[in-house]
Structure formats: C-alpha cells, structure tokens
C-alpha cells in the first residue's frame, strides 16, 4: 500500500530544510517520523516481550492475536481526557491491551529468522539482517540523511496501528529520499517478478501506472 501526502515536500526540499541550522524543521520532521513508525517494540526489549508472551500463553483464555480481530477503542472522554471518568479508564485499559497485542504480533510475525536467506557464496543474509540500531535519531549533516531511532536489529520499521489492524507481518517505511524510493521500487519489483528487472523497466512501469 502506498500513501501519498498531498502537498508534501520533495526529497530534495526536505534535505535542504533538514540541513538548515537556523530552522526548527529538522526537529519537527524527526518528531513526526518517530510518531508514525519505529523499529522496536512498544513495551520493552525483545527479551521483555518474549517473557510477556510466554506468561500470557499460560492463561487458558489467551488467544493468538494473529488469529483474532482487533478490538476497537472505546468512546473518547468528552471532558478533554479528564483521567477520572469511565471513558478515560476504559481507554487506558484498551491502550495497555493495544500495546501488548502489537508487541505480541511483532514477536510472532515480524522478527527475522535466518531461514534460507544465508544460501549464497558470501554466507550473509540476503535481507541484510541484523540491521544497524540507533539509540537516538541521527541526522547526517554531510548529506541530510536521517537514521531513525531503532532498538531492535531483527525488526524492520513498523507502524503500530497498521500492525494492530492487519495482524500479520507488515513493514512501513518513509519515502523521503531518492535512495529510499529506489530501494523500495527495486524490492517490490523483485518480490512480484521473482527476477531482477532492469532499472529503466522499473521506472517505465511506475510511469505507466501514474
């Protein structure tokens, strides 16, 4: 699924603004990107999540979240989230359920496992795992590249809301650079065709679609 943001800046415009030391654009862009996708679990580390899932499975009423439908959120508080009313308490419980469910799904569906990806003469993972992790989002002032905060080396970036709704393996990335766009187009074309396509054929296909 590809989402276009109306009025969005081009990758070059974003790069120029990010590298402007006099602008607060960089800070706002980082805040936005960190709010919509992440490369880590919500409730803790991989070890924490595994422990939580193992404990949850001991409950006779536990259900594998990849085999269930999502629970919709309760009605919002009409008093600007007072924190004391029934709606606020129900939403707090729902949010806790949301966080644990998302982490459970990620643990089951999104963790990369080295099965079949090492069958090459270099003995390296074809999917380039483990990925580099970043304790904080970093901005490379030499080229404007953004390395988004990422705590788990065996996870791609995800959007919690999408994971909660789809309830299976989903990856989410931001196409804010020419490099990212080329990488995703190449990945999708290879995934569909199962054989490498020439670059000009890839972009011709994109042109014909739009």
Which sequence ranges carry the predicted segments?
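Intrinsic low-complexity, intrinsically disordered terminal tails and linker regions enriched
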Residues: 2-210
């Amino acid at each position: 699924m590809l989402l276009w943001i109306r009025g969005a800046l081009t990758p070059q415009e974003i790069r120029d603004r990010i590298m402007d030391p006099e602008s607060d654009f960089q800070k706002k862009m980082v805040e936005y990107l960190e709010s919509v996708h992440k490369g880590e679990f919500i409730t803790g580390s991989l070890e924490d999540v595994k422990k939580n899932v193992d404990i949850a499975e001991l409950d006779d009423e536990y259900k594998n979240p990849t085999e269930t439908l999502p629970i919709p959120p309760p009605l919002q508080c009409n008093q600007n989230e007072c924190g004391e009313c029934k709606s606020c308490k129900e939403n707090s419980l729902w949010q806790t359920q949301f966080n644990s469910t998302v982490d459970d799904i990620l643990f089951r569906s999104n963790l990369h496992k080295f099965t079949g990806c090492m069958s090459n003469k270099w003995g390296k993972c074809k999917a380039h795992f483990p990925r580099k992790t970043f304790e904080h989002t970093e901005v490379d002032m030499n080229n404007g590249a953004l390395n988004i905060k990422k705590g788990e080396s065996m996870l791609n970036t995800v959007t919690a809301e999408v994971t909660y709704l789809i309830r299976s393996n989903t990856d989410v990335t931001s196409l804010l650079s020419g490099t990212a766009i080329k990488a995703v187009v190449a990945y999708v074309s290879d995934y569909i065709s199962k054989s490498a396509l020439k670059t000009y054929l890839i972009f011709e296909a994109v042109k014909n679609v739009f």
